[in-house]
């Protein structure tokens, strides 16, 4: 079995008047992430890691922020399309490990 490893990294600024999406889940918060799509940094990083492992460039190449069709798109669609690209190229996903960090501005989320 051949193993390939990819690393994904994504950053978006926290801004008011945007929804906050992480991993396809809407998080109740006063701020959201700025971006052309829904700005889900977690899914974007996963897409980059998968595409990188397959040597298929990056998310910006396949889903450019200059294309109107991706304006405010649900990033789960981008992940689905990324997985289709990988399957079409003969790849399967074995394992995904995820680390989320926000070093400059703590993101406090409480669950009651």
Language model features with spans:
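Single conserved hydrophobic/aromatic residue that forms the stacking wall/gate
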Residues: 98-112
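Active-site His/Glu-centered metal-binding helix of metallohydrolases
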Residues: 42, 46, 50
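A generic structural signal for residues located within well-ordered alpha-helices
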Residues: 37-38, 42, 74
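Short amphipathic
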Residues: 3-10
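Acidic-glycine-rich active-site phosphate/pyrophosphate-binding loop
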Residues: 11-26
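A short glycine/serine-rich beta->alpha loop
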Residues: 27-37, 65-70
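Glycine- and Gly-Pro-enriched alpha-helical subdomains that act as flexible
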Residues: 49-94
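Histidine-centered active-site/metal-ligand motif
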Residues: 12, 36, 44, 99
């Amino acid at each position: 079995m051949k193993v390939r490893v990819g690393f994904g990294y994504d950053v978006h600024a926290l801004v008011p008047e945007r929804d906050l999406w992480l991993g396809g889940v809407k998080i109740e918060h006063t701020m959201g992430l700025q971006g052309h799509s829904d700005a889900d940094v977690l899914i974007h990083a996963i897409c980059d890691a998968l595409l990188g492992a397959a040597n298929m460039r990056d998310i910006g190449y396949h889903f450019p922020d200059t294309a109107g069709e991706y304006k405010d798109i649900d990033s789960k669609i981008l992940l689905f399309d990324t997985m289709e690209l990988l399957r079409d190229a003969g790849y399967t996903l074995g394992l995904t490990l995820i680390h989320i960090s926000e070093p400059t501005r703590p993101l406090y989320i409480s669950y009651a």
